[in-house]
Curated annotation (Swiss-Prot):
Belongs to the damage-control phosphatase family. Nucleotides phosphatase I subfamily. This is Damage-control phosphatase PH1575. Subfamily I proteins are distinguished by three conserved motifs: the CxxC motif localized near the N-terminus, the GNFE motif localized about 40 residues from the C-terminus, and the KC motif localized about 25 residues from the C-terminus. In the crystal structures of the subfamily I proteins, the side chains of the cysteines in the CxxC and KC motifs face each other across the rim of the putative substrate-binding cleft, and the GNFE motif lies deep in the cleft close to the metal-binding aspartate and asparagine. It comes from the Archaea. It comes from Pyrococcus horikoshii (strain ATCC 700860 / DSM 12428 / JCM 9974 / NBRC 100139 / OT-3). Phosphatase activity is strongly promoted by several divalent cation ions but it is suggested that Mn(2+) and possibly Ni(2+) represent biologically relevant metal ion cofactors for damage-control phosphatase activity. Its cofactor is Mn(2+); Ni(2+); [2Fe-2S] cluster. Mn(2+) binds at residues 156-157, 191. Its EC number is 3.1.3.-. NCBIfam families: damage_ctl_Phtase.
Amino acid sequence: MKVQYECLTCMANQCQRIVEMATQDMDIRRRAMILAAKLLAKEYNENAIPAIAGSLIFLELYKFLGNDDPFIEYKLKSEEMARKVADIIKRKLKLDFELAVKLAIIGNVIDFSVGFSPEDLEEEVEKMLKDKLYIDDSKELFEEVKRAENILYITDNVGEHYFDAILIEKIREISNAEVYIAGKEGPIINDATVEDLKRAGLEKLGKVISTGTRIVGVPLKLVSREFMEAFNKADVIIAKGQGNFETLSEINDSRIFFLLKAKCPAVARELKVPKGALVCMRNKFKL
């Protein structure tokens, strides 16, 4: 997905949040935002993909600010709340595959870029459980998972990965496939890293691998050899969240299923769904 007109202000707003989280020094904040403006002028162009352009800008800001993980407190709070809510859900609900898919999508609400507060998670989950998927290819996903030999599950945000675990557990119940679970090489906004996935125990559910990059989504020209091998041999690829949609949506590959909440107008418009819609969509480009 190429940048839309809203992406510029979204990136600028995220830069401001990063700066405010990283330092209280007003002069450093001012100079950091001047740098951000220069970086935006460089990276925001008609061929840019939002997730990639934003990541390159954010990582340069991290260097300037001397803070390699300004979202650490937000991520820890998200992790704590998500673990509790996921445990409650597993005790209260009778989970089948389709509900597990829905929960994995609902978990995608945990996102700093849209101003989500982790304290609201339980209430948001209860509310969204009543919603139907606007695009629902979960039956196709179920059939593909059943016959797959290799499955690649690409995670998105910290906290959300506890909801991913619910779906991966269901996948393992219906499939004997080798499951690869991918996280980021290092911190970028509130995305889940390999370290986050391992700390949450996802190694028990599959082989945890790194994308080989800190860029949001999975720009295939920048990923590791290990990730590319898992990607190439996968019979099913489950890609969580908007960043993965932005970087993979133009690839002509029907193995990919996008699971996300359309949290911004640009992504919603690209998907042809209302903002806020829950989506389980097989890649629209067919092999």
